[in-house]
Amino acid sequence: MLKLIIYQFQYSKRQWLGTIPLLFVSSLIVGTSLFGIASAIKTANINASQLFQMLIIFGGTTLFFLISNNIRLLIDIFKKDYQLWAILGASRTQLSLLVSGQFYLMAVIVSSIGTILSFIMADSYYKFLQNLLGRDELPDLVITANIQSILLSIFIVPTIVGIGAYFYSSRILKISSILKPKKKKRKVTVAGFVNISVRLFLWLLCIGSIVSAGFIRNKEIIEKQSSIVLFLLIIHILIIQSLSPSIQMFLIKFLMRIFPTENYVINTGFWNLLSNPSYLKSIQTSMSMGVTLISGFILYTQNMYSFMNTANGVLEARASFIAYMSAPIILIITSSISLTILSSNKDIEDIKQLKTLGVSRLQLFKIRIGEAIIHSVLILLVSVIFNLIILILVSLIGQFLGRSLVDISGFWQPSLIVISLLVIFYSITKGFYLFISR
């Protein structure tokens, strides 16, 4: 099996290169965290140790979830190969091992390079936090390395990626029609309904817990119950994952009906996205989850520190945001870059067909920009719905405490920043592959 994994990796290494941005940044985050923790423990700097721990905990968890989007797209790219393997007698378990083995191999190569650079990164990250919080909170720290930290840094990301790749590829291959195209999907439909029902129940439970706290009129209980908003953010992410790409496809059709146009850029962009639901789900899930997570966390922390009259509330909110959210945000953005690169490799055949039909490179580039704008509009619409719920709940908590909202910039700023980055990265990446193809 190991030889087969290596041979298959060599055969498809061009496609696997698209995963480098996500794996490289993941290895930087994990390495920075491990070197920082080891150095902080050595000098008994408890505060610094906790800050570095947050990177690996939240970064590792985010990486595990993001792997599913990359796996889904890779399986779609290698669909014909896996169908051939299935005809030759390969089982779902063997195909899952083949996918996870290649992902693990790629992750080991990239992590080895990332570990070296993360040692330098750890010192820069700590100095940045030190300037933000002050030397009283974070005294000087000398970053050191040992064999244990280096080995863990090299193999933690491949381990997370390998386990995640096996889990998600097994699940996706079971749900998809790659192995048995004519098999009915009744069990999948029932499982999906149960999945959504459980998440909806948890969502209603969170909303009910927050609203009911207002009837108690006890400040301590209200402040304690308000932390459920953070759990609600996780539920929102899971709901987005469950509803994608159905909700995005509905919105595309809805927009096409409301704003009918004869512009070839917009029309072709709409139909390109509808024809590739696998990629639509992958990039929309990542970006919508990211925007929802960032906006919700900012809205909650900035206003809650103010509600509780915390000294240096803005400073603490920024520190919390960096400690808890920096790793997930960076990973989500790099995951989107990886997904765009992977999809661009797949687009090469479509580009050749369109060129044969007489479509110029400039026209194709305009279509790609149109796709980027449509992606951005969809992300904005989905995130606004969930952000509005968080905004209303935070405002309600403020009313319970006799306060009003201090800052609502988190409702719109992250969305504009993230979708602007998406348009730029999407256009550059797609444009690059467009102009290098012959």
Walk through the language-model features, giving the residues of each.
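Short cytosolic juxtamembrane segments of multi-pass membrane proteins
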Residues: 3, 174-190, 434-438
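Alpha-helical transmembrane segments, especially those used as permease/efflux helices
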Residues: 2, 6-8, 14-36, 152-167, ...
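Long, hydrophobic alpha-helical segments
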Residues: 54-70, 323, 327-334
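Hydrophobic alpha-helical transmembrane segments that constitute the membrane-spanning cores
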Residues: 25-33, 102-126, 293, 297, ...
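Interfacial "coupling" helices/loops that link adjacent transmembrane helices in transporter permeases
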Residues: 65-104, 334-373
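Short helix-terminus and kink motifs of transmembrane alpha helices
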Residues: 69-76, 119, 123, 127, ...
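Selective transmembrane-helix segments that form parts of the transport pathway or gating/packing helices
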Residues: 13-19, 99-117, 154, 192-203, ...
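Short helix-loop junctions at transmembrane helix boundaries
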Residues: 37-43, 114-149, 210-227, 300-311, ...
